[in-house]
């Protein structure tokens, strides 16, 4: 969950988020170096009085400023393409969760088990307990076992929604009549917050998501209690 005055990415909670943070740092390093170099060149040109009135062409410098940007783009594109393929890859999921967006709440179905489905509504401000987060707490949290490959299917019953957990680098659009999928792995036990990230009507801001990552044994006990 993003905290007050936090201007950076949220703490990583999945292997995919760790890869995305590494790519972010990689790209930012390149951008900062380019910014410093260009700024230094501009300042040096502004504050010196040297001039060259007979420069007609410069084959060498034109070659350099063509090749170097191409190399920089390749250095950014290669890890980006690798990440794009990794984000869409799902290998032998051990759990399937179907998520349905409504105006304005979420429905969850655990398709691997019988009769496990529930709705998740935001808890109104007046009904919050101590230490609950305003506009983020729900009446039914979504439990998942950590360190487990999970397949997520997202759709919508009315308008377009978007199921998003920033700390797990997951954002899936829920489109009526379509199923979008993604993989999810939590690398630690915790509670993760998210919100609908697609404007879906008057109460768009009141569709929080709470994912509770627990141990596999606790998850199995929860499944048995719901059966």
Swiss-Prot record:
The chain crosses the membrane at residues 27-48, 63-82. It comes from the Eukaryota. One of its GO terms (molecular function) is copper ion binding. It is an enzyme of class 7 (translocase). It is a multi-pass membrane protein. Residues 1-26, 83-227 are mitochondrial intermembrane. Belongs to the cytochrome c oxidase subunit 2 family. This is Cytochrome c oxidase subunit 2. It comes from Sitophilus granarius. The lineage of its organism: Eukaryota, Metazoa, Ecdysozoa, Arthropoda, Hexapoda.
